[in-house]
Structure formats: structure tokens, C-alpha cells
Amino acid sequence: MRSKNLLVATAVATALAGATSAYALTPAVTAAIPADHQLVIAGASAARDAVEAGLSAATFCQAGTFNRYRVATTNSPDLRAYSCTLATGSPYFNDTIENDNVVIFYRSEGGSIWGPGAIAKNVPVARLVVNASCTLTDGTNYLCPVSNYNLANDGQTATGNITRTLVNLGVADLEPEMFSGANWVEPGTPLGNEPAAGVLAALPAVPVIGQAFGILVRSDSPVAALSVQDITSIFTGNYGDWSQVPGSGTTGPITICRRERGSGTQTGADVFFNGQNCSPSALPFVHSTDNPPIFGNTVIENSTSSSLGTCMTANTNSIGISVANAAPTGTKFVTIGNQAPGRATAAVGSYDYWFEATMTKAGGLNTTVGLIADGLIAVVQDDTTIPTVNSAFALSGLGPVSAPNAAVLPVSTTRPVALARRGSSEGNSCQKPQAQN
């Protein structure tokens, strides 16, 4: 009898893992969710807020069923997971999967390139594991133990709640082809060498949201405004001292706090200011080793946004790059062309330093996994679910087929829709924003 009861209990638990529930999914239930209801995402940290906002929408996940999982050590490595029961009657996905339990893994460690890059190379990447080792901290938030992670080998020697799997959906701050050349990862990582010419460009990327980026200086710096020409001159090493920058009001050798290769923030700065991957006469971005500044001033490469903020506060006369949300402690954003960075100025067309974030589905996905991915793309595109952070805004023409995003004046102060797009419906970071008819 005991054996029979055990079999019944096991069958019930398995059924619950893939069927209806009206409560937040426990780690045990989440761990039992079958593979065809698991979606593995990798890539941009800047776009992660948009994904989480979409998942939090009651039209995607049923209210009260959403749980969030993170690594116990804050933001390093940045591996996350979300579980919930899919909503009924949702405009975002096929009704064959509504009311099902799903788990979505999001790996943003290393930045954008680890999404489309891993898909292009067909290599597994590190992601979180959800099980009974994850402990509830508050409400719906769990922390899971991971130790000894190293980006250089992407966790191959790490221990704890970590594994390596192929990527189903890549998220990047720009279209995949922008991550070639100087913006492919440093040599020696599991991603290996850059794929053959044309492979990244051929990936089926779709734009999802607009994101504004900005230039940081220290809070105690008198520098408040810079031109595109000034910033390009600094990032190419042609300005090495603030005394060379017209109207800076200060002097001293400039320290450049940049991001690592493969970061969407770094790639965007390289594209916008230096023309990388857009012009045959593109200028190389300063680097600590293979392209040092001609004046010999310091360049510090940072693997995360938080470490870049630390770099800024630790170095007098520093300059850095960031998605245009709240400036890190001890720093401030400058205006570019007398325009402050943010969703409102970007959406209305007065601030050009922004890009269309993209999502790329891997080929050959299981039907159910593909439906979950399609639903996630749709909810992230929707202007009603865009996160209310300063950097993010919706793109016109995207969103639900029944009610696509529409650009109107005056633009919303919380969830604006851009009056213009970069290039065609597939996005083109090399083109200036223009109205879409």
C-alpha cells in the first residue's frame, strides 16, 4: 500500500507541474516542470527589466503565481529564473498553452553577446538551477547558491545551482550583426572565435523595445554637457585630458571606464560614437591592451554595470557609459547636444543615442517552447507592459496585432511610444531614426 501511495503522489506532483495552479509555484513544483515548458534566455542585462515586466503582467502570468529566483551572491553571476502559471485568454500566446506552468531562465552574465552569440555558435551557456536548495527571502523572491563562477570558463568549475544548456531565445541591446569584429567576446571564452561572416546577420532577430543610453561623469565633475564629437574624440583616444575638451571647465587626464567586449552597452557606444560595423572608416574604441589611447591615459574594462559605477567613483576625471536609468551612486549623466538621456527625449526624437533591443529565437525549438518564446516576444513589445524605467520605450507598429503600439503627441511620460524607428521592421542601428509610414 505504501508503494502504491508513493506512486500516486509522484503522479500527482508531475501532473501539477504542467497543469493548472492558482498559487505561486514552489521550488519543488518549478523543478518538476517538464523540458517542453522551460525557456532558456541569455543576453542583455539592460533589457532584463522589460522581460520581467512582461512576465509580471497579469495578461501573461496568472496573478499570484509568479516567483523570482536569483543567485544568492548579489548580481554575480547574474543568473535568474521566473516561474508562473500562464494566463487564460492572453493576447500573447496560443491558447493551447494557457493555464500551463512554465519556468523561464534568464542569464545576463557577460551581456548581450551570450544570447545571439551562443545561438550562432550552438554552444551551451550557464544558467540557474531551481530546486529545494533555493530559499525564500521575501514574498515571491528566492535565492539559490552558486559558488566559484568564472566568466572566462562560464561556470565550468562552479558549484551549486548551476548547469549549462543551449539558448532558446537570445536578447541583445542591438541586432546581432553589430556584435562582430571588435565587439565579439575576448578570446578564450566558451563562445570561441567569431562565427563566419554573415552568420550573425542571418539570425532571425526581431526588435522589441527602444532603449536610451547615456554618458556618465563623476558627480563632483564640473562637466555637464558634451557633444558627440567630444565623446568620439575621448573614446578614440584623441582627447587624453579634460583640458582638450572645449568648455569642460576642468583639467586632468581622462580615465575611461568602458564595458567588456560583447556587452550591449559597449557595442552601442562603439556603433554610435565611432561608427563600428557601420562605416568602412570606423574608428576603434580605446582598449587597455590592443588599442591603448595615444596619450597613455588609463582605460579600465568592466564586466558589469555595477563594476563600471565603482570604476567611475574610484577614478577622478573618469568618463563611462551606461543604460540611461538611475545613474550609479557618485556619478551623473551629461547632456549630449543639450539633450538629457532618457525615454521621453529619445521617443520624441530629440535624443539619438538609443537602439532597438532585439530577440532571436534559436532554430528547431520544440513547438511548446517556441510558443512560449513567441508569447514573451509579444508581451515585451507591448507598450502597456514596458517597464517604467527612464531608459525604456515602446516601438511603433509592434505589440498585439489587434492593438499595435501607436506613436502619438504628446508622448507618454511613463510609457512613451517612439515617433521614429531605426531602419526597417528588422532594425538597423547604423541608420538614423526616421518616421515609419
Regions found by a protein language model. Name each.
Residues M1-V8:
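Bacterial N-terminal signal peptides that target proteins for export
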Residues A9-G18:
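Bacterial N-terminal signal peptides
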Residues A24-N437:
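Flexible loop/hinge segments at secondary-structure junctions
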Residues G18-A24:
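Sec/Tat signal peptide C-region and signal peptidase I cleavage site
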